[in-house]
């Protein structure tokens, strides 16, 4: 899957169980949540400017490894830098890797939900 534009990002995130979208901060920052917790944030104006990026949750050790390995991955902008990375598109992160990082973020957040909420989400029809 290639995420070339905001529509494809939207469809990729929405294809996961229990995902909802929100604008909790301002009308520019699109936030995807699972079970009421954020796993992906992006700025709509940055997409329009051609400089899109995502804020994604990441395992703290892996986050450090990724930042060392990729120029386009930095500590999370306006987020806990231990648990979040900012990943820029059009850099040295492949589309496949971008999808893996979104999946990793979703899984981390999903696993942090209560068993009851996890079960409710798994029972949803997608």
At which residue positions do the language-model features occur?
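Charge-dense, helix-prone N-terminal extensions
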Residues: 1-126
